C-alpha cells in the first residue's frame, strides 16, 4: 500500500530542519520546572544568577550565555517530584549523584551539548573536590558557578517572604553570610565574592521573575554557538533529549516517545513516503508528548478512571505540545502533526475535533502509532496487553471510523514485528 492509494489528501510538505537553540533550552527548562511544582522556575533563576555572575566576572559573552543555558537545564537528570524534593532537604543533600549522572548521560548523547556534559555531571561537587578533577577549565568553572547559583536559590527559600511576596533584607543577608561561610570549601572563592556583591543589589532579586528572565534570554546578542546551523541528526539528538525528559516523568510511559517515533518511521517507510518524511515523522514521534510535562503526576499515575477535570488536564497536553514545539521548531509541520495526534477521523478526537480529509496522512500515522504503542505498555489502571488484545481494540477503533483503516492494514500485515518493536526496551533495528 502506497500513500497515493490512501483516501486522504497529501498536501505538498516543506519540512524545515531548523531549531531555535535558545528556545530549546527554555523549553527543556519549562518542562523540568513542571517536575518540581513547589519550586517553579528553579532552572530559570539558576541560569539567570549564573549568567549575571559570569558577566560580573568578565567571562566572554559566549561563556556567559552557555552557563545561562546550562543553568536552565542543569537538573535535566531529575525525573520525578521525589527526586526534586531530595535536593531541597539540606545544603548538601544525599543522593545527588544519580541525577547528575543521568543528566551527564543525556547531554553526552546529544552532540550539540556533549561538550558541556561534565559541567552537569559535577554541578553538585564541592569546590575543594572539583578543583582537582581532570576536566576542562571551562566545564569546571561552569559546574562551580551552577552549583553556587543552585544553592543560593535553595537558601533563599528557607526564609519567609514579606507580606508582598518579596525576599526580605534579612533573608538576603543570611544567604550572603551562608555562602561566605562555605567559601573555599563548598564554593569557589572568587565566585562567592562576586555573587555576594550581586545579591546586595535589589535589581537581581527583582529580576528573578521567569518572564523577566525569558525576555532577557530572548534578547541576548548573537554568539556562534546559538547561531549555528544544526544538521538533521543533531536536531534529532535534541528531540531525543526532550523525549527522554518527557518519558522519565512516569514509569508507565518509559520509552513511549521513542517507540512511537520508531513506529511512525516504519509505517511511513512501508507507505512509500520519502526518507525526509520518514525522518520528520520520527522527529514528531519523539516530541509529540512534550506537552504532557505540564500534566500533574498524580493524574498520570491515577489507577482508576479519570474524572472530568482530570480528563481535561490530559486533553490539553496535545495543545501544549503544539505551542511548545512552535517555539523550538518554528512553523515546521512537526508542530502540527504532534498537535493532531489525538484527532480522530469521525471528529470525536481532541483538541480541535478535526475529521476526515482535514486530518492529513502524517497525522493519521502518528495517531495509530500512539494508540498501538500505548496499548502495549502497562498503565496504572491495567497491565500491558497481548498482541491479540491490542489488535482487537484497534480493529474496533478502525471499524468505528476513528482510525485510518489503510494505515492500520500496514500493521496487520506485520503485526508481530510491530508488536516486538513496540515492547522492546531499546531502539530496534528492523529491515
From Swiss-Prot:
Binding note for cofactor: Requires a divalent metal cation for activity. Likely has a bi-nuclear metal center. Has the highest enzyme activity with Ca(2+), followed by Mg(2+).
Domain HD-GYP: 231-427
Enzyme Commission no: 3.1.4.-, 3.1.3.-
Cystine pairs: none
Domain HD: start-end pairs: 39-155
Activity-pH dependence: Optimum pH is 8.5-10.5.
Entry GO MF terms: cyclic-nucleotide phosphodiesterase activity; metal ion binding
Residues annotated as binding a divalent metal cation 2: 289, 317, 341-342
Keywords (A to Z) from UniProt: Calcium, Hydrolase, Magnesium, Metal-binding
Active-site residues (renumbered): 292
Cofactors named for this entry: Ca(2+); Mg(2+)
Keyword set includes Glycosyltransferase: no
A GO BP entry: cyclic nucleotide catabolic process
A Pfam family annotated for this UniProt entry: HD
SUPFAM superfamilies, A to Z: HD-domain/PDEase-like
Highest taxon of source: Bacteria
InterPro entries hit by this protein: HD/PDEase_dom, HD_domain, HD_GYP_dom, HDIG_dom
Reactions this protein catalyses: 3',3'-cGAMP + H2O = 5'-pApG-3' + H(+); 5'-pApG-3' + H2O = 5'-ApG-3' + phosphate
Induction: Expression is up-regulated by 3'3'-cGAMP production (at both mRNA and protein levels). Transcripts are more abundant in biofilm cells than in planktonic cells.
Amino-acid positions noted as binding a divalent metal cation 1 in the UniProt annotation, renumbered to this chain: 288-289, 370
Phenotype seen when the gene is deleted: Significant increase in the ability to colonize the small intestine compared to the wild-type strain. No defect in biofilm formation. Enforced DncV expression in mutant cells lacking this gene causes an enhanced inhibition of chemotaxis. The double mutants lacking both VC_A0681 and VC_A0210 or both VC_A0681 and VC_A0931 show enhanced bacterial infectivity, and the triple one (VC_A0681, VC_A0210 and VC_A0931) has the highest infectivity, which demonstrates that V-cGAPs play non-redundant roles in cGAMP degradation.
EC category name: hydrolase
Subunit-structure text: Monomer.
Its job: Phosphodiesterase (PDE) that catalyzes the hydrolysis of 3'3'-cyclic GMP-AMP (3'3'-cGAMP), leading to linear 5'-pApG. Also displays 5'-nucleotidase activity, further hydrolyzing 5'-pApG to 5'-ApG. Counteracts the function of the 3'3'-cGAMP synthase DncV, and is involved in the modulation of intracellular 3'3'-cGAMP levels. Enhances bacterial chemotaxis and inhibits intestinal colonization in vivo. Thus exerts a crucial role in regulating bacterial infectivity through catalyzing 3'3'-cGAMP degradation.
Name of this protein: 3'3'-cGAMP-specific phosphodiesterase 1
Organism the protein comes from: Vibrio cholerae serotype O1 (strain ATCC 39315 / El Tor Inaba N16961)
